[in-house]
């Protein structure tokens, strides 16, 4: 794998920044040439806990603290994908497009209401990025290594990275949207959160009889998730057909095994 060091400003990185409220993820930066959350990346987490972490990113920039290195993968067609730094870049992009406020002198300020010197400070802050080029296996292995720090990748997030493709993309769209109205119902029976892939992991566990990795490997290039979705819904509907009420003790039971 080959790497080259590149310097960008926050303004350059955030040019053309696009954020999907539906999928809770940053889509593009660098005027559309940078894919911020490719298939193998985890969901955006810094907006959780009232946005504590994304505010901390802006605070670091204002205080001129280093944000750390970024790593981009250069694909065969010359486009860039974020390998490491997705949470930081999305936080910067969300702030620079007015998605949240930063407290300055006890006053909430969005980017357009900051004093001009502070706004320029943010826009002109330099970010160091390594551009990586290599085979898919090299890129995926490097992704796992550089993501050891920070918010630890859980086993399902790692499998999503290893077996990224149309199947994982469709499965994440179905089971990993924390704003989906069905999440509350699922959460009565499943422990964890949609954002950290816990519901997807459980759905895969149920349909594969616990052989999640084998199932993901077999279906990696499938363009639909009908079997996965239908089996999950069958289990949920079965639970609801048996119990008239939802009890706290029902959360986290091995429903897939009980159904089978």
What is each residue range found by the language model?
Residues 64-81, 86-138, 159:
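A short, basic-hydrophobic beta/loop patch
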Residues 72, 97, 118-260:
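Solvent-exposed functional surfaces
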Residues 19, 29-35, 101, 109, ...:
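Polar low-complexity intrinsically disordered regions enriched in Ser/Thr and small residues
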Residues 42-47, 99-104, 150-158:
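Short, polar/flexible loop-turn hinges at active-site or ligand-entry regions and domain interfaces
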Residues 7-10, 33, 54-55, 89, ...:
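Alpha-helix initiation and N-capping motif
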Residues 5-7, 109-111, 188:
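Hydrophobic transmembrane signal anchors and adjacent membrane-proximal interface regions, especially
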Residues 1-80, 91, 97-100, 127-128:
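N-terminal leader or domain-start segments enriched in small/polar residues
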């Amino acid at each position: 794998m080959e790497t080259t060091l590149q310097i960008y400003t926050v303004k350059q990185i955030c040019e053309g920044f696009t954020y999907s409220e539906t999928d809770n993820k940053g889509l593009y930066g660098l005027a559309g040439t940078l894919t911020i959350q490719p298939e193998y990346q985890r969901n955006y987490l810094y907006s959780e806990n009232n946005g504590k972490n994304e505010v901390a990113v802006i605070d670091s920039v204002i205080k001129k603290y280093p944000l750390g290195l970024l790593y981009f993968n250069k694909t065969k067609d010359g486009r860039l994908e974020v390998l490491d730094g997705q949470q930081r870049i999305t936080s910067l992009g969300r702030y620079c497009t007015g998605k949240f406020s930063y407290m300055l002198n006890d006053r909430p300020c969005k980017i357009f209401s900051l004093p001009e010197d502070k706004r320029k400070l943010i826009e002109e802050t330099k970010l160091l990025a390594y551009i990586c080029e290599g085979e898919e296996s090299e890129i995926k292995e490097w992704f796992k290594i550089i993501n050891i720090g920070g918010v630890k990748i859980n086993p399902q997030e790692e499998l999503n990275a290893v077996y990224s493709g149309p199947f994982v993309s469709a499965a994440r769209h179905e089971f990993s949207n924390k704003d989906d109205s069905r999440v509350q119902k699922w959460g009565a029976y499943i422990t964890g959160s949609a954002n950290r892939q816990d519901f997807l992991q459980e759905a895969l566990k149920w349909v594969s009889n616990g052989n999640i990795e084998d199932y993901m490997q077999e279906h990696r290039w499938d363009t639909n998730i009908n079997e996965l979705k239908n089996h999950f819904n069958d289990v949920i509907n079965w639970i609801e057909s048996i119990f008239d009420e939802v009890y706290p003790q029902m959360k986290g039971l091995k429903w897939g095994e009980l159904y089978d």
